[in-house]
Amino acid sequence: MTYLPVALTIAGTDPSGGAGIMADLKSFQARDVYGMAVVTSLVAQNTRGVQLIEHVSPQMLKAQLESVFSDIPPQAVKTGMLATTEIMEIIQPYLKRLDCPYVLDPVMVATSGDTLIDTSARTYLKTNLLPLATIITPNLPEAEEIVGFSIHDPEDMQRAGRLILKEFGPQSVVIKGGHLEGGAKDFLFTKEDQFVWESPRIQTCHTHGTGCTFAAVITAELAKGKTLYQAVDKAKAFITKAIQDAPQLGHGSGPVNHTSFKD
């Protein structure tokens, strides 16, 4: 009998396949994890931007959650695009009952710059979901939104990481420094430790779905029972290779390659 760890993503769609639950499921598969998905929003988007968003009904969202949790318990859960307070209020009770790692990707803006979350929902996210998370995975703009100040350098990143842990209560936070000048430096902050990864910047426009993919790999590794450090370390290596080997698709910010990384 073959055993596969199980990971669940709760997020929006991307018909072009580069981001959202499509990227998450590809990442789970690439890391030998059985993937499940609950759709929060139907998003018409591609490498050029977001064209239209329609949220699933509250009834459909609840039904999907019940379908999953009543039948196949996950070993790790990831949330991505949670666009409204209502969506978060429906999901939150399920997150509170989790007995497995919860990875919160605070998706607020698409790679194209399009806004993906209501203003009121940002407050709910910070006060009601962040305290439930095993790890949150903001990029610099998302971290700035959470902490309320600008981040210009690694020192600001460290200040932001410590503030997020203290004020909002997640168990850990990894802040991605891809938006800073210079090398790509990412920081992982836990209650006890601080770790940093640094790699040369890859000059490319093909970064669609990088945040989703990074968080999904962390989720997959945690579903396998890996430590936070091991999960983030693997995600960093995975996304670096995925960007390096991007398939040059689309007319805008193209997707990464979810198949290129091999252990």
Listing of model-derived features with the role each one plays in the protein:
Residues M22, E145, T204-L228:
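Short, small-residue alpha-helix embedded
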Residues T119-Q194:
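Conserved phosphate/ATP/ADP-binding segment of small-molecule kinases
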Residues D32-M36, F195, E221-K234:
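Phosphate-handling active-site elements
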Residues M1-L4, T9, G20, G182-W197:
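Acidic-glycine-rich active-site phosphate/pyrophosphate-binding loop
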Residues G17-V33:
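N-terminal basic/disordered segments at the start of proteins
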Residues T2-T9, Q29-T111:
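Conserved N-terminal subdomain of the carbohydrate kinase-like
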Residues L4, H55, D71, Y229-D263:
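Charged C-terminal helix
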Residues I10-S16, F195-H208:
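Short pre-catalytic strand/loop immediately N-terminal to key active-site residues, enriched for Gly-Thr
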